[in-house]
């Protein structure tokens, strides 16, 4: 089972991303919104294993220390497609605060998690919010046209955190949502 540390957004940012997910879905294009429990987010770390009992205190510290990190989504991006699918995402401006938060997650979980995915390592982290992860290459132009409705720049903030287990997707822990101050 894979464990994922996610940063969730304030209500307005969440709603803007969900609107894009719905627009993609209306055209028959898969998005994270197809999964009922999915929430718009930035992934801060992916681990093969987490000691859930001993990670509880560090996760609580993350919720306190990392509250209300500002974000500005300023562009759309594309992870190179394989022969069958591509990932289209909204990209936040990479700030010192965001990189410090990412580094802090790794520090807090270092003793409690293993098998970290290399593409979330410091120096390789590409912060993004997935808009579609299974886009056929032949539909990339169509998807980008739909995603252009995304209101860029979109300024918001990280408002809460969660620990997600995959296969099946389920939330194991989340911080209480902090009051967003925009």
Residue ranges and their predicted role:
Residues 86-88:
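Charge-rich, low-complexity N-terminal segments
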Residues 80, 84:
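A basic- and aromatic-enriched beta-loop-alpha substructure that forms the phosphate/nucleotide-
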Residues 151, 157-164:
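Short, flexible loop segments at boundaries between secondary-structure elements
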Residues 1-72, 95-155, 171-182:
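Basic, often amphipathic N-terminal segments
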């Amino acid at each position: 089972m894979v464990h994922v540390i996610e940063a969730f957004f304030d209500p307005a940012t969440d709603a803007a991303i969900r609107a894009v997910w719905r627009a993609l879905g209306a055209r028959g294009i898969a998005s994270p919104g197809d999964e009922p429990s999915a929430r718009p987010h930035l992934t801060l770390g992916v681990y093969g294993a987490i000691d859930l009992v001993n990670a509880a205190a560090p996760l609580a510290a993350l919720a306190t220390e990392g509250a209300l990190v500002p974000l500005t989504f300023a562009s759309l991006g594309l992870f190179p497609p394989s022969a069958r699918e591509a990932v289209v995402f909204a990209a936040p401006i990479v700030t010192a605060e965001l990189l410090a938060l990412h580094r802090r997650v790794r520090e807090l979980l270092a003793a409690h998690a293993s098998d970290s995915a290399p593409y979330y390592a410091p120096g390789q982290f590409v912060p993004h919010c997935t808009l579609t992860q299974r886009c056929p290459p032949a539909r990339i132009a169509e998807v980008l046209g739909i995603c252009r409705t995304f209101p860029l720049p979109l300024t918001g903030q990280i408002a809460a955190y969660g620990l997600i287990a995959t296969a099946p997707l389920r939330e194991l822990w989340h911080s209480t949502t902090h009051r967003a101050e925009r």
